[in-house]
Structures are given as structure tokens and as C-alpha cells.
Regions:
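A short alpha-helical cap/connector motif
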Residues: 1-114, 118-143, 147-214
Length: 214
């Protein structure tokens, strides 16, 4: 938690700039990811904003290379040869494809994908559909604040089942109606997900999801 707090990330128990409660995700990250701490890993973070979390991750995972995608990179304030920052809207599939190609990313490349982006329902589902395949075997896909569409109508921007119901169906290997995830997508998830866990942080909307690939 000290690293998230030091760099000013809202993942910390206390948000440094306001002294108010943060999401309190540190303990979940530590418990789930400590085994990767000294390994050479690639991390994709969606929604990096100022780069506070990315800087903390780089300090914690000293052998990591981190790729940061954000719609507005003008606020990003950290630099490192292992921090790679790209300005793009994650829902723009054409630009996403182009960016991944430019940086030489192939499927099964990222050890961690962390979605802390818009929290819009459509973006979370699209990112999961598209980027889960870029996880390495045993990789972990993380969605922060995944229940925002449950709490805030503006994040529920499409007519679709919510993430908590979606992951319930994935756990049960039960097909569901979706205009984003077709049968082939769902089959892929059924075959490639080994564990799904959710945790509650400090605040009403502090919900975090870990999906492990087999």
C-alpha cells in the first residue's frame, strides 16, 4: 500500500492528495500477484491517467515492462524506459489493432492486463473480449470498479447483462445473450478461464475482479 500511497494512486487505502479513503485494492494486488514480483513480466494498464499506478507497479515489479493506454495522455507525469505510454480510445478497434501491431505485441504476450479505464459497460466487455487473448498462460486479467454500471446509470451505456452476471455465467459455463461476446467468444472463455475471484475494497464502488487464464 505504501507504493500506491507514495505515488498518489487511488488504489491505496488513503488517497494521498485528498487524505480521503481510497479504494483499498493494495492487499488484493499483493495477495494475488506477489508471486510475480521478481519475474520478467509484461503489464498492460488501461486507464493510466497521471501514471501513479503504473509508477507503483514498476517499483513493485522491478523486472516489468509496462504499457499504458489512456484516451488522454497529457496528464501522464512519470517516465522510464520500461513505461510505454499510448494515447488511444480502447473502444477504437482499428487504432487498438494498429497500436498493438506497432509495438510488436502478439497474442499471449501480457502477464497482467489491468482495466481501470472508463468503467463503461461496453468498454469493459469489449476489452475483455479483445485483450484476454493477449494474456500469457497463467496470466491474470483484472477489472477495477467493475460494478460501476450497477451503481451509476451513466456507466450502463448499453443494453447488456452486467459484469457480475456475466462472470457468473462464465463460472457456470452457461451461454448468455450478448451483442459483444458471441458463442465463439464465450466458448473461448469457458475453455481458457481457470479461476474468477471478486473482492470488495473500502468504498461502495470499490469492486475488483481477477480472472486467471489456464
Amino acid at each position: 500500500d505504501k507504493l500506491f500511497h507514495y505515488y498518489g494512486s487511488d488504489k491505496a487505502d488513503i488517497f494521498r492528495s485528498t487524505k480521503e479513503k481510497g479504494h483499498g485494492f493494495s492487499k488484493f494486488y499483493s495477495n494475488k500477484l506477489n508471486h510475480l514480483r521478481d519475474k520478467y513480466i509484461n503489464i498492460l494498464e488501461i486507464g493510466s491517467y497521471s501514471g501513479a499506478s503504473a509508477a507503483a507497479f514498476k517499483k513493485y515489479f522491478k523486472n516489468s515492462k509496462i504499457y499504458c493506454f489512456d484516451i488522454n495522455i497529457s496528464n501522464f507525469k512519470y517516465s522510464s524506459k520500461d513505461l510505454n505510454v499510448f494515447g488511444l480510445d480502447i473502444s477504437d478497434k482499428k487504432k487498438l489493432n494498429k497500436t498493438l501491431k506497432e509495438i510488436g505485441v502478439k497474442q499471449e504476450y501480457f502477464d497482467l492486463v489491468i482495466d481501470d479505464g472508463s468503467h463503461n459497460l461496453s468498454d469493459m466487455i469489449f476489452s475483455l473480449k479483445y485483450l484476454f487473448k493477449y494474456l500469457t498462460k497463467k496470466g491474470i486479467y483484472i477489472i477495477e470498479d467493475f460494478k460501476h454500471p450497477n451503481y451509476y446509470q451513466y456507466n450502463r451505456n448499453i443494453d447488456h447483462i452486467l459484469i457480475d452476471e456475466l462472470i457468473g455465467n462464465l463460472k457456470d459455463k452457461k451461454f448468455f445473450e450478448s451483442n459483444i461476446l458471441d458463442k465463439n467468444d464465450q466458448d473461448y472463455f469457458f475453455d481458457n478461464i481457470t479461476k474468477i475471484e471478486t473482492f470488495k475494497g473500502n468504498l461502495k464502488d470499490s469492486d475488483i475482479l481477477f480472472i486467471e487464464k489456464n
